[in-house]
A protein has these predicted regions:
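Exposed loop/turn and edge beta-strand positions of beta-sandwich/beta-sheet ligand-binding modules
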Residues: 2, 66, 73
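Secondary-structure transition/hinge residues
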Residues: 24-27, 48, 52-55, 98
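Short alpha-helical
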Residues: 14, 42, 85
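Enriched for short, Lys/Arg-rich terminal
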Residues: 27, 70-99
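A short, surface-exposed loop/turn module that caps and links secondary-structure elements
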Residues: 44-70
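Arg/Lys-rich, positively charged N-terminal/basic patches that mediate binding to nucleic acids
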Residues: 1-39
Length: 99
């Protein structure tokens, strides 16, 4: 079975950077920020292998658009899958209070 390649949108990268900055500088916890960013990246990398484990988003509009979801702690990771080219595209990474 061929693994899927993962691409992360600029917006999702910015989401991740903003979340890390908030934890590091606003909450004054750089170690927690580093662990959170690392954990989210590890969760994203799991998608390459465990792609079928994750479902479409609960929101019917997002589901109709083919937006899938996975979680890392309080963060929801939104992504699409292109089976034709074996790619996963990370669209957004948002704190669950925002979604």
């Amino acid at each position: 079975m061929q693994q899927y390649k993962i691409r992360i949108s600029e917006l999702a990268e910015q989401d991740l950077e903003n979340a890390g900055d908030y934890i590091a500088f606003k909450l004054l916890n750089p170690i927690a920020a580093e662990n959170m960013v690392k954990g989210i990246r590890e969760q994203i990398n799991k998608l390459e292998v465990f792609l079928a484990s994750y479902e479409l988003d609960d929101d019917s509009i997002l589901a109709e658009l083919g937006i899938h979801k996975t979680y890392y702690k309080e963060y929801k990771i939104f992504y699409t899958i292109d089976d034709n080219v074996k790619k996963i595209f990370i669209v957004r990474i948002l704190h669950i209070r925002i979604t």
